[in-house]
Amino acid sequence: MEKLLLITPPFVQVNCPYPATAYLKGYLTRQGYQAEQYDLSIELINRLFSRDILLRIFDACTPEQMGKDPHLERMYGLRERYLSTIDTVMEFLRKGDNTLATLICNGEFLPQAGRFDAAGELDYFFGNLGTADCAKFLCTLYLQDLSDLIRGTVTEHFEIVRYGERISMSIPLFAKLEAELRQSRNPIEEEMVALLERQIEAVRPTLVGFTAPFPGNLLAILRCAQYLKERHPDIRIAMGGGYPSTELRTMTDKAIFRYIDYIILDDGE
């Protein structure tokens, strides 16, 4: 019997679960299929915004990179504060602990780089009763600063809620995407395929299905598919969702099928 693994790829909105693969898993299970669901998007975000990975990113920064951008140079000077606060910030965003919210709203706790410069007067916006919302806002600025660091030193394709969107919009031709796929995987993509490999080993699927709701998912899907073709050539790969059913359906270049076995349009035809 087929064993399916349904994956939400990097990156979708991180402040609420994206339900497509969970709904599809439930439907397939009721139909008697063996199916599992995995949110690779949130797992990779949790991995990237951790002390371990952040330390690696800072250690890999070069003087040339820092010298080109005062914003990044400012962040590098605050590296120890970022390393000492990142796990607390992520714990708060996952659990919403009010004690942590109060700590975060203390103006001395979070390191502040360029994104904070335009934050405005927080008391005016949140008052005394909006501590949790204020903390979420500050954490968002903090993570946006770190995203700028990743984009400036690791890969230009990174954003918290999308990956490689600009290059993925270059349809109907596949050449730009394939040129990117010929490049070595960057550190973010290495973390992504490491997480994928763990799930493949745990589930042992015969078919992996990716949902692609947005253009900012396509490059990550193709990187995962490329890895699966290299390491697990017997696994078949399918892709569906909002993006293939709309803009991507105009693609005429069949080279995409070197990576994806099936592209599912609309409701599955």
State what each model feature region is.
Residues R47-N106:
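Conserved phosphoryl-transfer catalytic core
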Residues M1-L4, V203-R204:
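A short, charged/proline- and glycine-enriched loop
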Residues K3-Q13:
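Nucleotide-activated donor-dependent transferases that construct or modify glycoconjugates
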Residues F11-V14, Y18-R51, M90-G120, F125-G130, ...:
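Glycine-rich beta-alpha loop elements in corrinoid/cobalamin-binding modules
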Residues I86, L143-L146:
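Generic preference for hydrophobic/aromatic residues in regular secondary structure cores
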